[in-house]
Amino acid sequence: MTKHIHGGDVYKYDHCLDFSANCNPLGTPQSVKQAIIDSVEDLSDYPRVGCGPLKEAIADYEHTKKEYLICGNGAADLIFSLSRALNPKKALLPAPTFAEYEQALVSVGCEISRYYLKEENDFCIQKDYPDVLKREKPDIIFLCNPNNPTGITISQDLLEEILETCAMQGIFMVVDECFLDFVKDPQKHTLKEKLEKYPGLFILKAFTKRYAIPGVRLGYGFCSDREVLDRMEAVTQPWNVSTMAQQAGMAALKESEYVEAGRQIIFRESAWMKEKMRQLGLTVYPSEANYIFFYGPEELFERCVAKGILIRDCSNYPGLKKGYYRVAVKLHEQNEKLIEVLEEVQAPSDKLRSSYSV
């Protein structure tokens, strides 16, 4: 099983500017901070069971049915409760992808098979995936769209073909759309409109990245199969979504201008960063999200930390070796600092080697 390591360890590297965690570069909205402050008056009461008002706000924001919703203590909480509820015996996971899927599945004794994403295909899922499903016959699959750490989306035609294959084969399909808000035209990549027709589809989302509130822990999921949601709630601890998280979520959902402003910054800065990184000889992949996946010198993580920059070393992801990294897209002044440090720590031999590596 993969060692449990994530980005965002600012406590261990408290002297560093953090590019390892991928959140909205504008930071937490002031209205959300105020909602958390105001919720202090309610701390003497238990949190609202079922998150009724929050679910109504999410349903309105996502243009879906409240009955399809379940809320959790972050997306990770829902991944674990779904695994406990379904208790699958075999899963097929892309490699590389978000580590929490495997952590949750292994915790319930599930066998893991991997679909390895290849560098020569820019780490994209290929058209053979439906055939692999038929051959492997898993009980459940997890697909991250866009994928983490690569930032690549799955083509909508292929995604729908996978969904249809899963329905025909009796495979439960989980699509993690936590980073979908940061790609261009996210409505062209979501499967939300397929929920009613496909009860074996679960879509995962979170407030963490969109509103830069990883410390709050608030996620949600959609599924049209009420039995699945009931089973998840049955294996989840009571009051798993705090009063502060519920109030923060309702305030955050009103911040549409903030979300769009963050998106525009990401689109502009991502293009600028990719060009600068390529000029440094780094191998940059076509990430579509609010982070950039690239290949460089094997010692780059340590060199950057020494210069006060924390990047995500992706070598602990299955399917990746030493030299693969991920960096968040932040505000321009911060991104300039990253590029400055990357240039400082790149030896001439590194630049030459990186241009032809992988």
Stretches found by the model and what they are:
Residues 1-45, 137, 171:
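N-terminal "arm"/small-domain region of PLP-dependent enzymes with the aminotransferase-like
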Residues 27-32, 50, 200-285:
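PLP-dependent aminotransferase class I/II
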Residues 47, 59-81, 94:
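Short loop-beta-helix segment that forms the pyridoxal 5′-phosphate
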Residues 65-69, 177, 199-200:
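Short acidic capping loops at alpha-helix termini that bridge into adjacent secondary structure
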Residues 84-143:
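PLP-dependent aminotransferase-like
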Residues 120-183:
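Active-site phosphate-binding strand-loop segment of PLP-dependent enzymes
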Residues 157, 306-307, 316-358:
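PLP-dependent enzyme catalytic core of the Aspartate aminotransferase-like
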Residues 267, 277-308:
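Conserved PLP-binding catalytic core of the aspartate aminotransferase-like
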